[in-house]
Amino acid sequence: MRGLLIAQFCGAFNDNAWKFMVALLGIRAATAALAPGQDLETASQTQTTLAMVVFTLPLVLTSFVAGFFADRISKRTVIITMKAVEVLLMAAATLALLANPTGGLWTLVVLACMGVHSAIFSPAKYGILPELLPHEQLARGNSILELFTFLAILTGTTAGGFLLAGAGTQPWLAPFALTLLALGGFAAAWAVPPVAPARDAGGLFDTLRGALSALQADRLLRLAITGAVFFWTIASLVVQNVLVYAKAVLGLSDALATVPSALISVGIGLGALVVGRLSRSRVEYGLVPLGAAGVATFLLILGWWTPPFSGTLA
């Protein structure tokens, strides 16, 4: 499982580092002539939203088709192929900033392609777990994968700002570093054990009908999907708005502006680890309402209080 964990870490790191680089480049260009105030905050929000939508929309639109292919092609093959694509995309990001150091259209094109790449990679990385691990180790294996994912989000989000700031007048060096990391992920993917395709029959619409039938028959599955949608929507909105808050309200540098967003991932990653330990060898649904109550409570606190940098980190 080590190869899968490293490949996943590199991919999630690059996704988030590049996404925040694109957002920060957009904010930098849009707010260069603006004084602190509402206009600066609006411009920052617009650029951050643009980066998030450009990454997320292709991911959402291609997720179902990605799941179809993950069932009919060896998941190991999908993982290795997507790691190779990631290397090419990070190289393209490097060329984009070589051509236009301020960002521009091609950085957004690469970001959209990273969204498609992530959509294709995700069902393979999660779907391969039951093929690699016995049932009693699935909860623990999933928690470790989630921990690596959120460690990657944490470090990638933070590194995006630091790499961009460190690159100075040569911003192409930042995605070049991501290209080297992508090469490491590609090498690690070859260590994933071979597995056979899960299915070799049925078309795309057969898969859709099967998925809808499973949803209709399983109430817990419907609740789990609904909960996941709400959770990731809230997480995305919080990360997006914390970045704007850091830049437009706190006036932080590119290097520091991504730190508050990164700490959100610390909490999620630690939560995934705790859930894995509490669940042991079973799936524990009772922990979900407890986690939801915690999210609601701390969001209310954040809404009532306008914290400084230290309070935002907490």
Region spans (language model):
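Alpha-helical transmembrane-bundle signature of multi-pass membrane transport and export proteins
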Residues: 1-314
